[in-house]
Amino acid sequence: MSMWIYFQGLDPSVLPGDPAGFEALFDVEFDELRRRVRAGEAVWLETGFFQLDEIYWSRGDGELPVFGGRQVPDPAGGPGHVAVDPPDVVRAAAYLERVSFPDLWEDWRQRQTPAPDEDLCDRLVRYHENLRTFYARSAERGWAVAKYFSF
């Protein structure tokens, strides 16, 4: 089973407010999603994003979780969507700029049994850098972020 999460930066005036609006935003050809990622308007994460969320939460300092936001439930029972308003995008960008991923990884890795492999570390480093760049760009533009989950 394929699992992924897609983050889309957008002007807050067009941030969907209901499940149908989110479905319309993300109901595009895969090539369009890839174009958005290449243009820096979006980020796509696959295997490992659950672990990355745990790593960010391990700080325990009450920062906005990068994967958090306002839940928009799916009436059909799917994973739903998440909306992040511009002030929280700024907070997430500041958090990602401030944290040391190697330190977070080491703290998290020491609590795992069995120890995670280096392939996972390499993937999560790339995800962290992609998210850091994406949230910084979105914050600079005053954007909101819409998230689409697929499980």
Predicted regions, residues:
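Secondary-structure boundary elements
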Residues: 136-144
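Acidic (Asp/Glu-rich) sequence patches and key acidic residues
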Residues: 1-133, 137, 151
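Short, well-ordered beta-strand elements
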Residues: 145-149
